[in-house]
């Protein structure tokens, strides 16, 4: 907990916000210490040995933003949950909005964690529900392709150059 607090206080602005598909902390004068830190501590209590691997990163200097592509392995402390429901690796993209201060350093003003819908489905309803979502998305993709082909056949839609 002390390390988490130290890292957040070193690299995040006091008014930093946090946005995750399951929860968020809006920007306020003390949102880092009275919100973001609590989210991180809650996740630390819920999950042990969380491993995050960064696969790629990009700094957009013009927009003061960092993009991270990562995988996160989560294992619950609760044995029943760990055995039957929750021990998985999830892919995500993390967006960090930065602000450069007078000291010349960049600080995180906003963290946004982005997961695909099937990753979130597996989090909420584990046990293969992510496969159902993937199949539904593939089915909808095929319906769209058929619809476009039908309208192109009728001459309603044409491909633009």
Residue ranges and their predicted role:
Residues 13-74:
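A solvent-exposed, acidic/Ser-Thr-rich amphipathic alpha-helical stretch
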Residues 17-19, 26-27, 75-79, 103-105, ...:
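Eukaryotic short linear interaction motifs
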Residues 5, 33-36, 89, 108, ...:
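Generic preference for well-ordered alpha-helical elements
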Residues 45-49, 73-88, 117-126:
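Short, cysteine-centered beta-strand-loop-beta hairpins and adjacent loop/turn segments enriched
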Residues 67-105:
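Exposed beta-sheet edge and beta->alpha loop/turn motif
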Residues 3-5, 53-55, 78-84:
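Eukaryotic intrinsically disordered and solvent-exposed regulatory patches
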Residues 1-15:
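Short acidic-aromatic low-complexity motifs
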Residues 97-161:
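Terminal "cap-and-tail" regions of soluble proteins that handle hydrophobic small molecules
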